[in-house]
Amino acid sequence: MVKPGAHTSALGKAVHDTARKNGLTVIKNLTGHGIGRSIHEKPDHIFNYYSKWDDVKLKDGMVIAFEPFISNNEQEVDQSYDGWTLITEDSFVAQYEHTIIVSEDGPIVVTK
């Protein structure tokens, strides 16, 4: 799934399908992204759900921050008054992140 030529939408579909299978949902207003010399690079987003308009393809050598955000109820988070904390009205949210190098030889997870 993480290989040159693969669509980022396939990652989002896998995250969303896995969440639904387990009675959970995904946070739709937070995404993964490309990473490199800057904290946010191309691709600008890696959704946690499938979008038919998301036709971004992974390229060999690209580095991505894969960040699934899973919730037991809500699909969006809001920013708290402190300008930093993200909150929901009545849900728990979990997030896990891996930095992955896209390679012809297979994905290289660098955050093990």
Regions inferred by a protein language model and the residue ranges of each:
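Active-site neighborhoods and metal-handling regions in enzymes and metal-associated proteins
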Residues: 1-112
